[in-house]
Curated annotation (Swiss-Prot):
Name listed for the protein in its UniProt record: rRNA biogenesis protein rrp36
Bias (Basic and acidic residues): 115-147, 270-300, 320-333, 341-357
Location (main, coarse): nucleus
Organism annotation: Talaromyces marneffei (strain ATCC 18224 / CBS 334.59 / QM 7333)
Keywords linked to the UniProt accession: Coiled coil, Nucleus, Ribonucleoprotein, Ribosome biogenesis, rRNA processing
Coiled coil start-end: 238-348
């Protein structure tokens, strides 16, 4: 019974203290939450009545338990005390108003924010030593660069850029060793000089490639007539050359020199004869083209007729004999007859030996 009385006294003292604290908190919050306290008070009165009834019932139960369990150990008393404490705490929570809860929640949020700020400050303080390490590393790196001479070059380049007003390209880094291959840019500086007016140059003139004579390889035939007219004096030179060779042949008595002069005369005459034949061919073709064009204009033909090689050769011979005199024509015909006869004899088969007898 003595233990139960002591426990009851302690519980009552605690309840009185808690009621005093609740009254003090209610007085503080009465000015701020007047409207909300009316509903809270009605709820709190009901909760207080319930708590009082629960307390009375708990006291009766405690008395009965004390009478029945007076001889229990101290461990049982402690368990009872903890249960009573829980019930008291629950009753206290029931008596707290909503305004007090809202105010407490706001105060807890502010405390949390202050705690986060304190944590961030501590984190920055933790980072400070790492920043000092970075500073030390940066100083070491700068010292190494100064040893290599990079910092001086960069400073000079920066000064030049600031003075000139534009940024120049940084110099390439030095080689790792003297045996390393040298790096050379493939870019070549373009000269700033520009030729606005080209100077007049003396060009050599070659008549073989003169545009007045030959414009292109495809237009050689068209320009032959103009070339012949331009170099017609060469025909006179050739004729005079043949005449001089013949005079020398008549005057010389040396056999070897005569043979050389005869060969020179025959080569010159053959060359002249070939040029004359080409000239006749061109004349025949020009005459034929004119006739065909005239017939087409008159409407007698729709398409031109192109001569064959055999027909062209026949027409050239015809024109050649027409241009000759009677004596020259007879001589030429005789030479031609002999030439054809010799060819026919070569083509004939060999005669048999028995046929001769």
């Amino acid at each position: 019974m003595a233990i139960s009385d002591a426990l009851n006294k302690r519980l009552r003292a605690r309840r009185d203290e808690e009621e005093e604290e609740d009254d003090f908190e209610d007085e503080l919050l009465s000015d701020e939450m007047e409207g909300s306290e009316e509903d809270g008070r009605s709820n709190s009165d009901e909760e207080q009545e319930d708590s009082n009834s629960d307390a009375a019932e708990s006291e009766e139960d405690d008395d009965q338990d004390d009478e029945q369990d007076g001889d229990e150990d101290l461990s049982d008393a402690q368990s009872i005390q903890s249960a009573n404490d829980r019930e008291a705490i629950q009753s206290e929570f029931r008596q707290i108003s909503f305004g007090a809860l809202a105010k407490a929640q706001n105060s807890i949020g502010k405390k949390r924010k202050r705690g986060a700020e304190d944590k961030s400050d501590t984190r920055t303080d933790d980072k400070k030593p790492s920043s000092t390490l970075d500073d030390i590393r940066e100083r070491l790196r700068k010292a190494r660069e100064q040893k290599l001479g990079l910092t001086n070059n960069n400073n000079n380049n920066n000064n030049q850029n600031n003075n000139n007003g534009y940024h120049s390209k940084p110099k390439p880094p030095p080689r790792s060793s003297k045996h390393a291959p040298a790096v050379q840019s493939s870019k070549v500086a373009v000269s700033r000089k520009r030729t606005i007016i080209e100077p007049t140059t003396v060009k050599s003139r070659d008549p073989r490639f003169d545009p007045t004579v030959v414009k292109s390889s495809s237009s050689v035939r068209r320009n032959n007539s103009s070339a012949e007219n331009a170099y017609s004096f060469l025909d006179e030179y050739r004729a005079s050359e043949i005449k001089q060779l013949k005079e020398q042949l008549s005057k010389t008595k040396d056999a070897t020199q005569k043979e050389e002069l005869k060969r020179a005369i025959t080569s010159a005459t053959d060359r002249q004869r070939a040029l004359d034949n080409r000239k006749r061919e061109r004349e025949v073709l020009q005459e034929h083209k004119k006739k065909e064009k005239q017939l087409i204009k008159e409407g007698k033909k729709s398409q031109p007729y192109f001569l064959k090689k055999s027909e062209l050769k026949r027409e050239v011979l015809k024109k050649k004999y027409e241009s000759m005199g009677s004596k020259e024509r007879a001589k030429a015909l005789e030479r031609r007859r002999k030439k054809v006869a010799s060819k026919e004899k070569k083509d004939l088969p060999w005669a048999r030996r028995g046929m001769e007898n």
